[in-house]
Amino acid sequence: MLIAAVAAFLVAVTVAASAAARPAAPGQASAGPTDVRAAFFTNWSRYARGYLVKQIPADKLNVLDYAFGAPTAAGTCGLTDPWSDYEAPTGADQSVDGVADDSANPNQHLYGNFNQLLKLKAAHPKVRVVMSLGGWTGSKYFSDVAATAASRQAFVASCVDLLLKGNLPSDPATIWPPSAGGPGAAAGVFDGIDIDWEYPGIDPGNGADHSPADVHNATLLLQEFRRQLDAYGASAGKHYLLTADLPAGNVNSSGSWELAQVSRTVDWINLLTFDFHGSWDAWTDFNSPFSLDPKSPPVPGALMSTWSTAGTVDYYLANGVSPDKLVVGVPFYGKEYVGVPGTNNGLFQPHGAPPSNDSPTYHDLVDTGLADANLTVIGPTAVSRTSNTGNDGKGLNGFARYYDGAAKAPWLYNPTLNGGTFISYVDPHAVADRARLVRQDKLRGLWAWEISNDDDAGDLTAALSAP
């Protein structure tokens, strides 16, 4: 979910909204939770960290986005990892309900994450599960499937068939367990579809097909999704959610999305309010600044008043998006730079070549001992940790924690590691700032990328509901 790669394509705009001038554009009434607390869960989490559906703190969420499905070269809806999605048997110790899958049972047709998601929903009936299509590597064929009325209709129909009706591919000769898949096997798993097209109309460097016609075709694609989801929902007796993930900053100024029309079509918009900065920049800065520090070096081509979480919200509201359609994104990961001099404790300084892992997760920082998660001051119902050192969020093992009051963003700096190591990240304090913004501006809620990146205690997820 990178937005920085599109920076060269940004076009400056002349509209910069102030908080006092925010319009509340009328939007289509939407269903689903009015106070969204969402997180993404990926089908590769089982490999990357051994993080399973059973570990998701569903009691702290009301929406779970599953990443990713994707459009295929054939113009249909596809799964990006069928083994993880619906084939991999789950043992009793890893199952949500403690019951193992039976790969020898010819009557069991659903395994993997999909089966565990059904069990998660049974245990937490308020949680809606939404399949996200696309992402950075899965957006290649969006331009093609959105190009004509016929291609849009066929693609959306295949998504309804695969994801909502649950008609999964099956072939005992090539799929194991041989009973996996088939008609209706995944019925009831998903309560909606999320579109993460990165990005219509431009070449962000991810190999995605693109055309100037994408900008309007993306709107038409969402409208076709809305039409078919509503039609199928009427027959099924429920409302299926439709959401879209849209970029931060002024990337939309001359369009990669028609904001007001999209707002009226979807239930809500997930704002990609992160990756404002990273190792692609010539200097260190914050991955997800809450607001703009005036000392932040300008990004070429960017309207800097939009280059923060609060600035992005202002921009969307000024361009016709209703507040109740905006869900603010929170990254559960940071950005790391090395070869950073000690001036200003590493902030806004030049850096060396990117490290092998330039996006450490909050789990990496806390559970491996670089940052302390004992935070006690975010409010009367604060996140409180007693198992760590008790030093209220300070850096550990050579790192010191600093805080930029203008950007409302923390960072870690170690002057001796790798010639000076700077890590921008989000902690529960920063999540609480975003929760207050949501309440202040009457926005729809918060969402996180992604749940397995949280620390073992789930501190960031808990902070999504901070006072």
State each model region's role.
Residues 1-24:
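Secretory targeting and sorting signals
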Residues 31-177, 213, 307, 357, ...:
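Glycan-recognition patch characteristic of GH18 chitinases/ENGases
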Residues 60-62, 66-73, 81, 186, ...:
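Aromatic- and acid-rich polysaccharide-binding/catalytic face
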Residues 64, 131, 195, 225, ...:
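Conserved, mostly hydrophobic/aromatic
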Residues 48-51, 243-283, 334-351:
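Substrate-binding cleft/loops of secretory-pathway carbohydrate-active enzymes
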Residues 43-47, 68-73, 135-140, 197-204, ...:
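Solvent-exposed loop/turn segments at secondary-structure junctions
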Residues 140-262, 280:
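Active-site cleft segment of glycoside hydrolase catalytic domains centered on the general acid/base Glu
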